[in-house]
Amino acid sequence: DWDAMIDTNVKGLLYVTRVIAPKMVAAGRGHIFNIGSIAGTEAYENGAVYCASKHAVHAISQSMRADLLSYGIKVSEVRPGMVETEFSVVRFHGDRTAADNVYRGVEPLTGDDIAEAIAWIAQLPAHMNVNEIVLMPSQQACQYYVHRKS
C-alpha cells in the first residue's frame, strides 16, 4: 500500500524527528539514526514508491545533518541491502514462497546485523560521524546482482 509506505518511511521519520530534535537541541548533543535502503539510490523494477520513499530518507538525512550540525547533533543514515524481514512477505502480498525465494541461496543480513552497525557508529569518538553507511550481505554486489549459492 503506497500510503502506508510513505506514511511509515517518510512521514514517520519526520514526525519522530520533530519530537526528538528539539530535546537534542536543548541538550546541545544527540545522534539521529535514519534507516534508509540501497533502494534509495538504486531503483528496481516495480519498486517506484518504495525506492522514492527511501530516496526521501536519504535526502532528509542530508538536510537534517546540515540543519542540526551547529547544535552538536549528528545524523547518520544506515542503508542496508538485502535484510531478511517481513518486508518481502508484504511486497509479495502474503505469498510466502515468493518472499522466501528472495533469500534463496543467500545469507541475508538480519535486524541484529543492522543494530550492531548502529551500536558501532554510536560508540565512535565525539569528533567522528558516519554520515551514511551501506551494509550488504557479502553475496550482494548491488541492488540487482546477488551471487546465489546452489
Where are these regions (language model features)?
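C-terminal helical subdomain
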Residues: E77-G81, T85, T97-Y144
